A protein has these predicted regions:
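Extended, folded cores of ATP/NTP-driven motor/assembly subunits in large transport
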Residues: 1-172
Length: 172
C-alpha cells in the first residue's frame, strides 16, 4: 500500500520510494535496418543506464481511447476563422487513424523504486535518474517525462474503472 504521496510525484511504500516516467514510442518499424540497429543500441543504453540498486518496471498499457478525452485533448477546436477548413481536415485524419487502431492507445511507463533512508536521499536519487532518462530517451527522440501525482493516479483510475475515465477527479 502507498503510505505517502509527495507533491513532486514521488510515492513512498514502506522503506521504498518510487517515481514513474512516461516515454513515447519510436518509429522502429519504419526505419532502415541500420537505423533500427542504432535505435536498439540506444534503447539498450537507456535501459542499462538505470541504477542497479533500484527496481525498475516497464509497463505497457493498452487502453481504449475515450471519445470525450480524444475530442478535448487531441482534436483542434474550430475558431470561426478562415483556418477552420484545415482544422476539420486535420481532425478528420486523426479520427480516421483512431478508428483504424480500433480506438486503442498504447501507453509506456518506467517506474523506478529504491530503498532510501529519507525523502531527501530519494529526491536526490530521482533527480539523477530523471536527468539520465531524459538524456538517453532524448537520443531516441522518444523523451521520458516524469509523471506528477495527477498523472499517476489517473493511470490507476482509468485502469481499474474502464469506461469511467471522465469521472476522474484529483485535488491534493
Amino acid at each position: 500500500p502507498i503510505q505517502k504521496i509527495y507533491r513532486d510525484g514521488i510515492w513512498q511504500t514502506g522503506g521504498k520510494f518510487s517515481r514513474t516516467w512516461r516515454f513515447a514510442d519510436i518509429n522502429y518499424a519504419l526505419a532502415s535496418h541500420e537505423d533500427q540497429r542504432d535505435m536498439f543500441t540506444a534503447y539498450c543504453g537507456a535501459l542499462n543506464s538505470l541504477p542497479t540498486d533500484a527496481t525498475t518496471k516497464i509497463t505497457i498499457n493498452n487502453r481504449r481511447l475515450n471519445g470525450a478525452d480524444f475530442q478535448r485533448s487531441v482534436l483542434m477546436r474550430e475558431r470561426g476563422d478562415s483556418l477552420d477548413s484545415y482544422r476539420r481536415e486535420y481532425n478528420r485524419v486523426l479520427t480516421d487513424k483512431a478508428a483504424e487502431s480500433n480506438d486503442l492507445i498504447q501507453d509506456k511507463y518506467i517506474t523506478v523504486s529504491v530503498a532510501r533512508k529519507n525523502m531527501d536521499e530519494a529526491r536526490t536519487f530521482f533527480h539523477r535518474v530523471d536527468a539520465d532518462l531524459s538524456k538517453n530517451f532524448g537520443r531516441l527522440e522518444s523523451g521520458a517525462k516524469a509523471l506528477d501525482n495527477q498523472d499517476r493516479l489517473r493511470i490507476f483510475h482509468d485502469f481499474f474503472r474502464p469506461g469511467e475515465e471522465e469521472h476522474f477527479r484529483f485535488d491534493l
